[in-house]
């Protein structure tokens, strides 16, 4: 598919335990549609804005050959959609993983390198009620993820290199529970 194209709709086979969707619009909500309401679990994975722009600039230049000026024009042109359609989805998610660099990214338009996971923290935020709904034990997570800490009653911070491990610790039991509950209903 070309950038900006959607994959075609497909039927989900009977007996499917889990449908995993990855993309920009998993929690989109608007006039006449509410994709967020169809999901049992919404997980957001998003870098802080300047990091997102650095990644876009590097990717679009390396993979598509776009000039820095053309990429900045694209970012500016898409800003209303970003503000009105992308960002609000993260208010719908149960859990957000947000990567925040610990190196200077104050001007994303001149950054030479994309900060590595080890040059970042990941803020893991749980929407109000999500910890209780999914049985998330902050004490367990803090014990299991070295150097993690709570930054608020609803957020844990981990080293960027530990994001995959944190996702595994958090999401695996949730998915198992979802399948168990589905099996009880059938």
Task: Outline where the language-model segments fall.
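C-terminal accessory "lid"/substrate-recognition subdomains
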Residues: 12-14, 18, 35, 49-186
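Short His-Asn-centered micro-motif
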Residues: 21-24, 45-46, 99
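Inter-motif core of Ras-like GTPase G domains
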Residues: 34-46
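Phosphate-binding/switch loop-helix module in NTP-utilizing enzymes
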Residues: 1-30
